[in-house]
Amino acid sequence: MEIIKRNGNVEQYDKKKIAVAIQKSFASVGTEIKVVLIDEMVGAVEQFIEAHSDMRNVESIQDQVEKTLMQNGFYDEAKSYILFRFQRTERRNAINSIVADAEDEDLKPILKKISSDYTSVEYSLLLLSDKFKSFCKDDMKQADKLSALVKAAVEMTTQEAPNWEFIAARLLSYKLNRSIAAFEESVSVHSFYDKLRYLTDERLYGEYILASYSPEEIAQAATFIKEERNDLLNYSGLDLLMKRYLIRTYSNKPIESIQEMYLGIALHLAINEKEDRMLWVQKFYDILSKLEVTMATPTLSNARKPFHQLSSCFIDTVPDSLEGIYRSLDNFAQVSKFGGGMGMYFGKVRAAGGKIRGFKGAAGGVIRWMKLVNDTAVAVDQLGMRQGAVAVYLDVWHKDLPEFLQLRTNNGDDRMKAHDIFPAVCYPDLFWKMAQEDINQPWHLFCPNEILSIKGYCLEDYYGEEWEKRYIDCVNDARLTRRTLSVKDIVRLVLRSAVETGTPFTFNRDHVNKANPNGHKGMIYCSNLCTEIAQNMSEIESVSTEVKTDDGDTVVVRASKPGDFVVCNLASLSLGHLPLENESELTDVVRTVVRALDNVIDINFYPLPYAKITNQRYRSLGLGVSGYHHALAVRGIKWESQEHLDFVDKVFETINRAAVEASSDIAKQKGSYKYFEGSDWQTGEYFTKRGYTSPEWTALAAKVKEQGMRNAYLLAIAPTSSTSIIAGTTAGTDPVMQRFFLEEKKGAMLPRVAPELSDRTFWVYKSAYHIEQQWTVRAAGVRQRHIDQAQSQNLYITNDFSMRQLLELYLLAWRSGVKTIYYVRSKSLEVEECESCAS
């Protein structure tokens, strides 16, 4: 028997559909029904159909189901069924109206899926249809009508109906894929291999992909694509991917789909795998496309492309010489050119009034060099997208500190300002001890070059008790000139700048160096632009300059020792999207991303040879997290609670253990990093310093000692300001600033909604500015035990915060073992995030 559908098509009669409809009508009112009774009513409907051949259409059959329910006395169920039919009719009418207004029949299945997935009344397509009509004009082109439809969905996103941002993303995804399909048709691209061949020929894709993978492997990789994972993206995330990360034509049209982007990145990350390469391609693709992991902005943007600079963070130790300073400026320019962020340690540079070649008072000090750093940041923009970004670090005992702390403030001599750099201060434990015990004690500022010339050592080359001993030695040496202020004066300058500008960043040098697993090979003087990296550093040293003849030409050859020019590759676990209670699954994701990050080291394009040398010596990683507040909220865990601290203690210990074991297992297969012997990893000190004494940790320590470690450094929590938007989660370890707000960008209002905002999570998402900051600092201290590097840890203060309250937060952070503090975010202050570290 054949049944006529509403669109005129014919399909075979299926009595299961009638049975399901009857069953749903009972379920909707909470009553049970026996299967025998359902069969009886289905039989009655079938008798009617067989007796009336002219009534064999969907509407007539549904009318008969209503009558059968009422004839059997099921009035509530019949009422529910009638309401269901009415809603389905409304839905069909809304879909047909949108399709007609958009002049696009292919929209119908997309709208049907949306209607099926979002059944609540606040997501009715009738509402979308009405909104769309207000935007849609008859003279619009079809593409503009699709844009208007997307805009309509975006503007319907509210605190009460947050999922419209996912509906808007589906419509935008359809528009994108429609545009890409038309482009592919125009250039005769019919497969993923064809696509890669075209992109390679256009020099939009790196030749190395097709040179390394066979056509059969590319075809196999294409089968990994799961287009339905586009539905995981919200509008803000998809919009950001389209604008910044997808490959575009030279006329600026996106020609790469979202899933093709993730697969292309996976192909690049797995390119050097010797065994099970396609398995690793699939595993890398899965963690990225499921939004379980986000790679840092440079990796996400540049992997698979001809110029594949994949690293986020670079740190240079600036020498105290004209040649060295200008080389560091050039290093910054080269890093910035390829989209990296920079940290620069100026603690070795002589202070203002210091000697130059014996002439007293000749040195201009670090502030003059700050102006050049500032101008370099402005002049050399990141891939033409935005100006360079650099944090400049100075020790709290440096003679130029008072002027340094006023670089970004609005008062004072503008010739002494550098508004486009981010100042940061390195503190020893002694400073915080004195601030805690008696803030009125004197604090002495010295010139590092003068200490070296008179005392024969560099004070900055020591930490802990040895530093304190030498600092007191300097204080007691009358030959050393100094500036003496009280600790209170220094603190006042720091806090005033922090409240006004958000900076200086904080680097607790003794905490960092005492926990350094590679202290046998160097010293950590400072951190990077976003304060999460802490690795061995040393300056580049000039060796010689020779004039030679090469093929009849005279050439000048400059030789230098590379030092430790820090570079780090970042990725983040999206905690809000991961099964954190399932240790096995979480461990598998961590192991996968550690392998991906280790591969980045070998496939990376380095803007400087010094960076390549250091990266291959240490093979350092920076695995962090995003979605921290998201993960707490969906579990109903309040930020200001012991439950929060206990939960993250367990989660971060699991992540750390998985990362250490993954690195050790890779070392067994591929070899350890160069300086493993003598490291805290090898001696076991890494584990004892952190109190890792359980049987699991003891066994892992023995395993590491036997197998080695592939990577010198593993964990670092970056801010993830951009990539957390892509993943539709909260940034880094920060709490949300607002549950819902509208952000104006290029004339459009974009909704920003806390992830999975609902009646259940609403009150758990407490604003960062309303959270007691002591809980934030305590949580950072709990996490720090499990993080071998550092964290981009922000503090959030309101306008009624006193200087004493802010100082207490700094002291609590120091007492809690927190290594670094990033911005102090005042409610009246807006600060600009670093894109490079936005992993």
Model segments located where?
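Terminal amphipathic helices with adjacent charged low-complexity linkers/tails
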Residues: 74, 80-88, 164-196, 427, ...
